[in-house]
Amino acid sequence: MTLPALVTWSCYFLTGSFPQPETLLAILQTNVSEAAGYLSGHLSLPLLLCLPLYFGALFLISGKSSTGELFSRPSLLPRLALLLVAPVSLALSYSNPVTTPWIGIKDYMKAYADFEQKSKERTIRLTNLTISSAPGLYVLAIGESENSEHMNVYGYPRPTTPWLSSRRNDPHFLFFDDAYSCYVQTVPALSYALTAKNQYNGMSLSDAPSLIEAAKAAGFHTVWISNQVRFSAWDTPTTIIASEADEQHWRNSHLGTTADLDVYDDALAEELTRMKSSEKTLVILHYMGSHMPYAYHHPKSYEKIHSDDPYRDQYDDTILFHDYVMEKLYETLSARPDFQTLLYFSDHGEAIDLHLDHNPTIYVPEMTYIPLYMVFSDTYLSAHPKLIGNLVTRQKSRWTNDLVFDTQLALMGIRLPDLYEPENDITSDHYDDTPDRFKTLFGTRAITAK
């Protein structure tokens, strides 16, 4: 219990709240460099006092002196009493704030294992699909920790998105103003976004087909291109889904040991220039984006924003660089004759103005504020006037990113009759955009409007 207790209490002194299982999962999946970057911006006096007090207590209840000899009887008895009381107290208080989140991790581990084991069963469910898609290249791009309220294209006063802002009135681009994340950490959010599971259906994650599985069943060639680390402490649904792709290109070789990059995010577009055309292709790009530590993930030439809040400035620099990344991606895609659609969203936001990042334990609405926009080729626009018309009228409709699965399949012309939910398909005539029905934190919190 020593290390788990230390982690739990450290989280408490960092945030003022005990962690949830999802927070501990994120900690276990982090690396030394990322953790150091986080702590450098969040050190506090309680945390600094926590560590020496904790280890001092461990020393006092240890059974031996520094010379290896047993302490005298008067000192030994209280130590033995503490050693006996501690495990008994934990056993009698199974649901205490120190042990409960660690017990919750076991449930997540089982859910992840079940998801991996049931892949074949899910594929069998995909034999009854209908396909109306035209040949071509369909792209899904996933941002990281990007808060739409820090993007000039959505009204933020700083010039963080000069390229996207210049495209706001381009008929090939549609920007959606009321998009939110279903969770405020990457793995949980993408576990829903990239599968048929969402907050509004009763499906279990293990039974939910993934976007890659559905695309392959429809005859698409699938490609996963990522600048995030490939492995963490264990496989998650995101890494399992990625491993199902016909092609995988991992541009970050550090394998969970560092937050450094081999290349910046703009290099991912190079993979598309080398990719041969096929009849139908789905490409999923997973960027490092605005992941902490912010200064690590863009060239120094993009350190352009300066004020009396360097933490906020560094974050806005990542938004500015990512605007260039998406400009380069668009130039690459528009040069390809097979390009059809691009859908971009972020996994979650960041409560950057409050210096709270994205922690469900200390949830604030800004952690859910994300961008959503789509780009279409001339060919696609002319071939799908009804679908485009629906999207145009929905640019101010509410949407959560656990509906990516429904949205992307609709853009690709893939229909799963046994799983289709028209009320969750923003391209559908029957999309339900009633604001009050939308939730976050896996259905436990109502959405707070931007």
List the predicted regions and their residue ranges.
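Transmembrane and membrane-interface helices of multi-pass
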Residues: 1-103
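Active-site-proximal alpha/beta segments of enzymes that process anionic O-linked groups
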Residues: 92-140, 145-303, 396, 400-402, ...
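Short, P/G- and charge-enriched loop/turn segments at secondary-structure junctions
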Residues: 126-129, 357-362, 392-393
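Metal-dependent active-site segment of extracytoplasmic phospho-/sulfohydrolases and closely related
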Residues: 139, 321-360, 405-409
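Histidine-centered active-site microenvironments of extracellular/periplasmic hydrolases
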Residues: 159, 338-339, 345-385, 422, ...
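A short beta-strand-to-alpha-helix junction
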Residues: 182, 202-209, 308-320, 362-368, ...
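Active-site-proximal cap/lid insertion segments
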Residues: 231-236, 288-336, 361-370, 378, ...
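C-terminal, low-complexity/hydrophilic appendages and adjacent surface loops
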Residues: 444-450
